[in-house]
């Protein structure tokens, strides 16, 4: 019997090499930064436990920036829930590129990034559907970032 895939543990520092920005934009021209998250914590903004939606199962509704910050705060306050971030690889017309992309889990990623900056979180759980060499790099098994495209 084949074992069901339950995900992988990857290094946040390796993900940051691909995603160095400290912000994400759910709403056009309204980026949410790690500084916004810190401001919300300092001002005791309440967290949001209700999920945003799944891009495949449930169409996400338009939410305010404050709602997204509150959702990030939920994961900051409950880091054990930072799991199942869905990753794949970027692709071009004919090639699979050695670049991971986040399919689902941006609130979790922003919380993980925030906690990493504090020095309190270094690894996260993901569901990875991409190239094995890129996964090995993200896990810390390879020292060199893959560069070659695969046809």
Model-based region annotation:
Residues 5-8, 30, 62-65, 127, ...:
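Intrinsic-disorder-associated interaction segments
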Residues 1, 148-151:
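Short intrinsically disordered terminal tails
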